[in-house]
Every structure is written in structure tokens, then in C-alpha cells.
Design a protein with these regions (language model features):
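Beta-rich accessory regions
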Residues: 33-36, 154-159, 167-187, 483, ...
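Catalytic cores of secreted or luminal carbohydrate-active enzymes
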Residues: 107-120, 621-670, 674
Length: 764
């Protein structure tokens, strides 16, 4: 079987890092999956969302975004169409004016506003598709007076929202009406928060101006910064185009109106520009591929990839809880005790490491904030972050919180697990040595500084808060994170020959660190504190997932894992959406595809909204994205120096396929299951090194595009086989193939579950 040559596209993103970091280019080389393997237009058309009527709220709206700017389209009532406008980096800056108020009020996300269109007739139905392959919404809205056809998109490479409308028959829509958002923390407008400042003025009134066909809505901030929504209407409301942009100046150092105006003036909607927009999205999707026999789940997975590139980009801000789609929320910030971790979790396996640059860049640029977040006596060698922050990552952990045990010590350490994954998936040793390792060392030091030794020499962690549960000593949240950090530091120090003077101390602490507290029901929250009430977080189980310190491949720990999972899930009333994705991921790690599938289906049935957004008291972006990670973990898992192919496939799935999913060791992996059997595995080694595969593939031949003879070892591992190739060649593609494998262009097999499903609002 001939090997396919892959097209590579390289882009250079210049990341400007503040001192003491240098200005360095981040180079992304991405292999595109060719059309000979996937009929991309046909396959992606199956992933579209469809609306038979306009949604009535944020969670049933049509969402479009480019990583910074976004819109959400729905109806306020049967004669009013609403277009929410959002820009994800627009935050307040009154922290110096109100130093006693919390950052959720002084540095909160701010709503931009929305447009409305009033229809003459009553809206009766719609025929709209969100074409995620082209990132365009298009279709028609029917009223009792006629129809309105429309197309909307947010340009991939320009910060402009474009909406084209054409009303027909007797339908006459009124003009576009702009409604500025109230420039105040959305949390302040919620009823339940008890931390509201006593004196909290709104930002100054907006200033509306019109100049040369452009309309400007400038919203000043109390610190003399501001943001401007600029728009231009070509034609009229019944037949024309609306162009919208938003400029932002957080610190009175830029001209936000000029920025928005230039965006509109430079916008080009000719065929070449539209093609460039579409091509950006096409190249993005073609970096990896997943096909499932369950249409609902397959569609959901691809929509999450669409949402990821809609909420962040390599050169855009870190993703918060809303992305570019603002809404009423008590959480107008970035959360560090689970949410951000889950948001970025799918990017590695999906082969979209470039999206992680928004997070990694933020950690590096705001390194000093992370240092200043710890008490002054530890700033020489430690760093941390509290529960939530704005984009500057300022979230101090105070001496008073430490003394009371009310703080969450391990938030930064858990976050750095994902930064370390960037290394394991790329083998980028320079980034490991110069950025990841030093920051991980500081994060570990923050925990080490607080350890207390008992009379037996065992190190314990004093009272701290286990997220959303209780204050406890020896919290498993903290101990598991410290244990992972120490093991990782020791490993990196050895492999990179860094000769770190602290290596001996790390080994001593790790050897004498308190054991993870365990009771009759499995892992406890912490010392003498069992989980005996419903708890949506799985932070007390991080040693199982995602750290894999305690895992299913350790026979002595299988009962403990099962018991801990059962106890956590038996208390159901407080379980949230991410509890279900967490359960699915843990079951996938237990090689139980049926239970992973069951928990994901229950998540879809109970919690997932029509546009796949997720709601609690406000929007929280991470849960659907975490579910995408759970789906990946059913298909492939790479940890502990092994790549596991189809480790947790549901028994009802007979055919599934993936291409160019990225694995630890910098391998791109493709695999096909046909009629319940693994028939083909293809691996491209990007950095060389040892390759260890675990699969249920019984009989196969192995070949390479770089050499005629391949030395490998084959072992029995339970009911599966382990294949070890000690020396792969950089750029080499290896293929393990069954004689009965039949290669087909995707889409290659019919759906067996939810065959007629489309997300959106439609008859299923």
C-alpha cells in the first residue's frame, strides 16, 4: 500500500514576551490531511447545525466567532431578531479607583451590546444552517409577511462581523437598532452574590456619533480607557449589509474608535477575501480527523473544534468562561481551579497546539503576576494563582488565607500539567527548559514551603481548601498535584541533564510525602474527611485523572479506583456537566467504553444546549470542551510512554476512524476499526525516539516509508499486544496493517446511532 504524502503549511507567529523573556517566533508546522483520504466538503456538511426556527436565548442561538470577536443570533420575541456582539478582551479597569473591591467587579468582562431587527410579520419558522466548515450561518427566516434570507460570518483574519439580509414578499423589517450593554460587571446585576461593593458606579454614559456613513458608540471607562462599537449599513435593513467592529483601549493608551474604524475601512468582502476566510477554517479542520458511528457524538466533537477556534487563537486572549459570546453571568473572569484546565484539554490530541499559545503566552508574559500572587517572603522562588483572575493573572493568595486554610494551593500546578503536555506532545525541549520547567519549579516551591514534617519524618500539607468542598489537611487535590510536580521535575532534571541543586530535596520529599488519604469509600477529600455529600468537582481524584499516578494498569489499584469513582458518583444532586465528562474520562482510563459512552450520552441528554453551549448560573465554556477530550480518550490515550489505540470503544461501535491525532512523544497517529477489529494503524514520528503501541490488533504487517527493515519487539499485555520500536526516524511514517484492511475515502461508513441528528433547533 503506497504512503500518502502530506502537505505541510507553516505559519510564523511572533510572540512578543515581556522581560526577562526574549521576542521569539513560535513556528507551527501542520500536516494537512489530503482530500484523497477525506472528502472534506461532504464530510463536514454532515456536521452542520440546523435551525427550523430561531432560538429564544443565548443557549439556542447561532454562534460565530474568530477568537476575539463574536456574535450570537436568536430572537427576543416573535417579531424581534437579536444579534449579540462580543469582544472577549473587553474588561473594566477600575482596580486602582476601587482598591477595596474584588476583581470580579473591578476587572470584569463587560458586555458590548446587541443589534435588533423588528420584523413586520410574526416569525413562524426558519431554515438556517451553521456551516462550521466555512464558519458561516446562512438561510432564511419565514414570517407571516414573507421571508428574510441572510448570511452572517465573523471574518477569520479581520475583526469584522458581516451580516447580509434580504427581505422578500410583503416582509419589511425596520432599521437596525443598536442597544449598548450596561457597562458594569455582570456579577453586580446578579441577585445572589454577597461580595458586592457598597458603592459601585456605572461607567460614564456612551457617546453616539455618525461620521461619513459610519456610526460609533463609544463607551468611556472610569479610568479613561474605553471601547467603541463601530458599524456601517450598506443598503437598507430590508436589503443590505451590516458590518460591525469593536475597538478597545483598556488603559487610555490607544484610540479605540480609530481601531474599530480602521477595521471596517480595511475590510474587504470580495471573493478573494471570502475565500481566505474559508480557507483558514479548512486548513484548521484538516489538521486532524475523527469519524464515529454515532452521529450526535461525531457532530458534537466537530462543533467543539469549531468553538475552540471561535473562542481563542494563538495571537488572541486566553479563553475565559464565555469566549466572545457575552451573557448575564456571575463569573465574568477566568477560573483556575478547573475551568481553564478543561477548556484547553482537547487541543493536544486534536493536533491544535497552536490554540494553546493563548494560554502559554499568558503564563509567560504575566509570570511576574504569578510570582506576586504569593506572599512576599516566598517570591524569590515560588509562584501561584488564586481561584479567578482577569487577563493579567493577578489573583493573590494572602498570608491570612494561608493561615485560615481557605485557599486553593494547587491551581497553578494543575494548569501547568497542561503546559507540560505541550512539551510531551511536541518534544520542544527549549520551551521545556526555559519556560515550563522554571515555572513548574516555582509552583512546586509554593507547595513545598508549606509542608510540615511529623515526628516520623512524613511531610504533610496543612489546612487548605479542596475546591467547592471543605478545608482539610492533606487535601488530595494538593498532594496529588505536588506528587505529580515532583515526579515531573525529577524526570525533566534527569533527562535534560540540568543538574538542579534541588533534585535531592525533591526526591526526599517525594519519598516521605504523606500518602493520599484513603478510607472505606476510596480516596477521601483529605485527612479524616470523606466525601459523604454530592460534589461536582473531581479534584480529590486528580491522582487518577488526569495525572494517572494511580491508574488502571496497576492491578493493586483497580479496586481503589472503582470504589472511589462509585462513591463520588453515588451522590447525584450536585453533579454538574463537567462531572459527567470527568466520569467518562475516568471510565475511559479504566478501558470501559460502555460506561464512558453512557456518561457522555447522559451529559448530552440532560445538560447540553441546542448550540452545544453549557449553562449553570451563567455560561461556562469548558464542559462541552472537556467532553470532546473524553471522546478523544475513548479513541486514543497516550501517557506513561505508551500510545493506546482504541482503548475504550463502546461495544456497540463496530466502525470508527481517526487521522492525525497527536500523541505524547510527538507522534501523529491514524487508525481504523472495521467491523469491531483494528485493521490499520499509521504513525508519523515528528521527533524520532521510541514508539510503544498498545492495541488489540491480532495479525498485521509493518512497513516504513524510510527503511525496508524495522526492528521491533512484540509483547502480550493482558488481552492486547504491546509493540515497541526503539528507534523511529524523524519524519518517518510507520504502518501496521491487516491483510483484510480496506482503505476508503471518508466518510467511509454509515452511522449506526442517531442517524438523523443535527445540533441546533430542529426535529430530530
Amino acid at each position: 500500500m503506497p504512503f500518502k504524502k502530506l502537505k505541510y503549511t507553516c505559519s510564523i507567529l511572533k510572540v512578543c514576551l515581556l522581560a526577562p523573556f526574549l521576542v521569539m517566533p513560535f513556528i507551527v508546522c501542520v500536516a494537512q490531511i489530503p482530500g484523497s483520504e477525506v472528502n472534506w466538503p461532504a464530510f463536514m456538511a454532515r456536521q452542520n447545525l440546523k435551525w427550523d426556527n430561531l432560538g429564544k436565548d443565548y443557549y439556542s442561538g447561532i454562534i460565530l466567532g474568530n477568537g476575539l470577536l463574536g456574535t450570537n443570533i436568536y430572537k427576543e420575541n416573535d417579531s424581534l431578531i437579536r444579534f449579540d456582539i462580543g469582544r472577549s478582551d473587553v474588561v473594566d479597569h477600575r482596580e486602582k479607583l476601587m482598591p477595596g473591591a474584588g476583581k470580579l467587579y473591578t476587572q470584569s468582562r463587560l458586555p458590548i451590546g446587541y443589534f435588533t431587527l423588528k420584523t413586520e410579520g410574526k416569525i413562524t419558522s426558519a431554515k438556517i444552517e451553521l456551516d462550521i466548515y466555512n464558519a458561516e450561518a446562512k438561510g432564511s427566516i419565514s414570517t407571516t409577511k414573507g421571508t428574510i434570507s441572510f448570511t452572517a460570518f465573523v471574518a477569520a483574519n479581520q475583526n469584522v462581523i458581516s451580516v447580509s439580509l434580504d427581505a422578500m414578499q410583503q416582509e419589511k423589517v425596520s432599521g437596525w437598532e443598536w442597544n449598548p450593554g450596561k457597562s458594569i460587571s455582570p456579577r453586580y446585576l446578579q441577585a445572589y452574590p454577597t461580595d458586592k461593593p457598597a458603592n459601585y458606579p456605572e461607567n460614564p454614559p456612551v457617546k453616539m456619533t455618525i461620521d461619513n456613513g459610519y456610526t460609533f458608540c463609544n463607551q468611556p471607562l472610569l479610568n479613561n480607557g474605553g471601547y467603541t462599537t463601530a458599524y456601517q449599513i450598506n443598503g437598507n435593513a430590508s436589503s443590505g449589509k451590516l458590518l460591525v467592529s469593536v475597538g478597545y483601549d483598556g488603559y487610555n493608551s490607544l484610540d479605540e474608535t480609530e481601531e474599530a474604524l480602521n477595521n471596517l475601512k480595511n475590510f474587504n468582502a470580495d471573493k478573494e477575501s471570502i475565500a481566505a476566510h474559508r480557507n483558514w477554517w479548512h486548513r484548521y479542520y484538516q489538521q486532524s480527523f475523527v469519524a464515529l458511528p454515532d452521529k450526535r457524538m461525531e457532530n458534537f466533537y466537530w462543533i467543539q473544534l469549531y468553538k475552540l477556534a471561535s473562542i481563542t487563537r494563538a495571537d488572541k486572549p486566553i479563553a475565559d468562561l464565555m469566549g466572545p459570546w457575552t451573557a448575564a453571568t456571575p463569573w465574568p473572569a477566568i477560573w483556575w481551579n478547573l475551568n481553564t484546565q478543561l477548556t484547553y484539554s482537547p487541543i493536544f490530541t486534536a493536533n491544535h497546539l497552536e490554540l494553546g499559545e493563548s494560554l502559554f503566552k499568558s503564563l509567560n508574559v504575566h509570570r511576574q503576576s504569578l510570582i506576586n500572587n504569593v506572599p512576599v517572603q516566598w517570591r524569590n522562588d515560588a509562584a501561584a494563582i488564586g481561584r479567578s483572575s482577569s487577563y493579567d493573572l493577578v489573583s493573590p493568595i494572602t498570608d491570612a488565607e494561608i493561615s485560615k486554610g481557605t485557599f486553593e494551593p494547587a491551581n497553578l500546578t494543575w494548569m501547568l500539567y497542561y503546559y507540560y503536555q505541550y512539551y510531551t506532545y511536541t518534544k520542544d525541549e527549549q520551551t521545556l527548559r526555559t519556560k515550563i520547567y522554571p515555572l513548574l519549579k516555582r509552583s512546586a516551591n509554593f507547595l513545598i514551603h508549606q509542608l510540615k514534617q511529623d515526628e516520623k519524618g512524613i511531610y504533610h500539607f496543612p489546612m487548605s481548601h479542596s475546591p467547592e468542598y471543605k478545608n482539610v489537611e492533606d487535601a488530595n487535590y494538593t498532594l496529588s498535584s505536588l506528587s505529580w510536580a515532583l515526579q515531573t521535575l525529577i524526570k525533566v532534571n534527569g533527562e535534560q541533564q540540568l543538574k538542579d541543586a534541588d533534585a535531592g530535596k525533591w526526591s526526599l520529599i517525594l519519598k516521605n510525602l504523606a500518602a493520599f488519604p484513603v478510607g472505606d469509600t476510596g480516596f477521601l477529600i483529605g485527612k479524616d474527611v470523606p466525601l459523604n455529600s454530592s460534589h461536582r468537582h473531581y479534584s480529590h481524584l486528580l491522582m487518577i485523572y488526569p495525572y494517572n499516578l494511580v491508574n488502571w494498569e496497576q492491578p493493586e489499584n483497580k479496586e481503589l479506583i472503582s470504589l472511589s469513582l462509585k462513591n463520588w458518583l453515588m451522590y447525584k444532586n450536585a453533579l454538574a456537566g463537567f462531572s459527567f465528562s470527568g466520569a467518562a474520562s475516568i471510565y475511559a482510563g479504566m478501558e470501559n467504553g460502555d460506561m464512558a459512552y453512557q456518561w457522555l450520552n447522559e451529559l448530552f441528554d440532560r445538560f447540553m444546549q441546542p448550540n452545544t453551549l453549557y449553562r449553570e448560573s451563567g455560561p461556562v465554556i469548558e464542559t462541552p470542551l472537556a467532553a470532546a477530550t473524553s471522546i478523544q480518550e475513548m479513541l486514543i490515550q497516550s501517557w506513561g510512554d505508551k500510545i493506546r489505540i482504541f482503548p475504550a470503544i463502546p461495544s456497540s461501535w463496530k466502525d470508527t476512524s481517526f487521522k492525525q491525532l497527536r500523541a505524547e512523544g510527538a507522534f501523529l497517529v491514524s487508525a481504523d476499526m472495521q467491523n469491531g477489529q483494528t485493521k490499520n494503524i499509521r504513525i508519523t514520528s515528528l521527533k524520532g525516539g521510541t514508539l510503544t503501541l498498545v492495541s488489540n490488533m491480532a495479525k498485521f504487517s509493518i512497513r516504513s516509508d524510510k527503511r525496508s527493515k524495522i526492528d521491533y519487539q512484540q509483547y502480550k499485555e493482558g488481552e492486547k499486544i504491546k509493540i515497541e520500536i526503539r528507534k523511529t526516524i524523524i519524519g518517518e511514517t510507520l504502518q501496521l496493517v491487516s491483510t483484510s484492511f480496506e482503505e476508503k475515502q471518508a466518510p467511509a461508513f454509515p452511522y449506526s446511532e442517531y442517524q438523523n441528528w443535527f445540533w441546533g433547533l430542529n426535529k430530530k
